[in-house]
Design a protein with these regions (language model features):
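Alpha/beta-hydrolase fold catalytic core
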Residues: 1-28, 49-50, 91-93, 266-280
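Acidic catalytic loop of the alpha/beta-hydrolase fold
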Residues: 225-229
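Conserved HGGG/HGGXW glycine-rich cap/lid loop of the alpha/beta-hydrolase fold
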Residues: 20-64
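Catalytic histidine-centered segment of alpha/beta-hydrolase-like enzymes
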Residues: 252-261
Length: 280
């Protein structure tokens, strides 16, 4: 497999960490969620034929943490930043693989759907009617309470919090906890508060108002034991994307490829095909 290159690039004055696999043809952009970063995508990057890009959003992972007074950490602000990252990396047509808050890139995809070759959604934040934020998100969205809660995070608290991502409340691998914890700091928590507070339910719905414009083949993979995002929203996303296939995983949670490692190869096969519709 092609090697995975790492580096940083300045985008709007923000030092932005990325992982890249070189190759021919339109690249695939992998966009992480909260509270993780581009290392989430390592199993995919190790298997993809290339080309591919994964980056750390400002405030997360190894990217810089500009002050909220200097940077827009809102859903729309991060969506615009992603567009400028693609511009900086000279990316035009591309495929998308998104997880959790990575769904914010669908804002730009609806505006320029002709640039999207293929789309993969993995337990993505819900840009649809009917979603109510989960318990931790409601804390982050509450002024003063969110700031107070962020002072109380420890590795142990993170471990307990991430168990909610699984229906049986089982522990994640300690290496996964370390991967997340090693890059969480005050700048990340500032970004988290501003991101969640920018996204009341009506704004989420508005952000997904034109999902039908994305006619590229789409694969929706949903871990049904996710306690952050209810199982029904996988089918709801698939119903809004006109050229989609839904894969529901009964024994997987919010990070479906961790609980069901075969997801990685399924996604890689989907990205590699040129057929109009997803393949079984």
């Amino acid at each position: 497999m092609p090697p995975i290159e790492t580096g940083t690039v300045m985008v709007d004055g923000v030092s932005t960490f990325f992982r890249r696999v070189h190759g021919d043809g339109p690249p695939t952009l992998f966009v992480h969620g909260n509270p993780t970063h581009s290392e989430d995508w390592q199993p995919f990057l190790e298997r993809i034929q290339g080309p591919a890009l994964a980056f750390d959003l400002p405030g997360w992972g190894r990217s810089a943490r500009p002050s909220p007074a200097e940077f827009d950490y809102s859903m729309d602000g991060l969506a615009r930043f992603t567009g400028r990252f693609l511009q900086r990396m000279a990316v035009e047509e591309h495929s998308l693989v998104v997880h959790d808050w990575g769904a914010l890139v669908l804002i730009g995809a609806q505006e320029e759907p002709e640039r999207i070759r293929r789309l993969v959604l993995l337990n993505a934040v819900v840009l649809l009617p009917g979603y109510r934020w989960h318990r931790t998100a409601r804390v982050w969205r509450t002024r003063r309470l969110g700031e107070l809660s962020n002072r109380l995070w420890t590795r142990r608290v993170l471990d307990l919090g991430l168990r909610e991502s699984r229906g049986d409340w089982s522990r994640h691998d300690p290496a996964f906890i370390d991967m997340v914890w090693d890059h969480l700091d005050g700048g990340t928590f500032d970004a988290i508060l501003r991101l969640y507070r920018s996204a009341p339910p009506d704004r989420l719905v508005a952000a997904g108002a034109h999902l039908e414009r994305i006619t590229a083949p789409a694969l929706v993979v949903w871990g049904m034991r996710d306690r952050y995002i209810p199982a029904r929203f996988g089918a709801a996303y698939a119903a809004r994307l006109p050229n989609s296939e839904l894969v529901e995983l009964a024994n997987a949670g919010h990070w479906p490829w961790i609980d069901a490692p075969e997801v990685v190869d399924r996604v890689i096969r989907f990205l590699a095909t040129d057929e109009d519709f997803p393949t079984p």
